[in-house]
Amino acid sequence: MPENPSGSHARPGDVLIMVGTLKGAFLFTSDGSRKKWTMDGPHFPGEEVYALALDARGGSSTLWAAPGSAFWGTTLRRSDDLGATWSNKDERPVRFPEESGLSLKRIWQIRPGPIDEPETMWLGVEPTCLFESGDGGESWAPVKGFLEHEHRELWTPGNGGLCMHTIVPHPVDRERMLVAFSTGGVYKTTDSGSSWAASNVGVRAEFLPDKHPEFGQCVHKVVSHPARPDRLFLQNHWGLYRSDDWAESWQDIANGVPSDFGFAMAMHPSDPDTVYIVPLESDEFRCVPEAKLRVYRTRDAGASWHPLADGLPQEGAYETVLRDALDTDSADPAGVYFGTRSGKVYGSADDGDSWTLVHEGLPPVVCVKAAVVP
């Protein structure tokens, strides 16, 4: 079990796991060996934290968090000292225009922009919309082409709300970006956000009369690797897919998984053929199959999947891993981390081959982000 220090002690080269829960955020720090972890938290006690990010562009270490309260709403907080202090909680820079008739319910995703655009950032929010900042997060505005999309009145919330949980900027072509939300599916732009096209060909919507509509799919997560920018992987509400043409079409890759239902999906930091998922049983039960906690990994871009269970409980483990609660660091070998709704955090320092319990007893985990501190 990790120690519980009085403050943040992350140093350059350390690995940081940022964990968002329904009752605050927790920071876990280790050296490069990733064998012993120290915990700092809770930050924002009593508030839900669905989105966290470390912005390491330019050698900086800026933490971003989006704590939310049912009474006081959602805020966006910044720390320039790895969580020792945070920006003013009363600042509310993320707002919908009054004429839109919308109000911010929750921030689901914080995405720093390209390395050579240090002032650019994006947010995915609920009700579903993409916000952009061009001044390092000081001010924010919704992307007009998405806010005013002709499909907006037809989008409906899933069980988790009408939430934009995925933002995938194209690493080469700055005019291209892909987003995903529940329930609406995948949309992409090729003109810097002026227009957006539904991009769900091949992705099924099992819960609709038309199983393959233009939009309306309940996509749970999409990931890509910068070395293969036009290839995408998608975990759907029933369905596991890959696209090789920047979401023009999707192919089923549920080869050897116990269930193609799940939420979480993460990309290996250096291998564009390696992806991690955590399958869940059925639409109603939503726990890992056979009560065995297993991460599944493909090393051939979805042609086959294999369970990773060394160090994970294989009996009586009725666990659930949510859509943003699985991530990888950028170390070599890669670290892989996930959190469960029962408040456990697990980590691997060897590409997922073996696992250890980082911490247990946390509130329900909804977000896990990992990074090497620059």
Where are these regions (language model features)?
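Extracellular glycan-interacting surfaces
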Residues: M1-P374
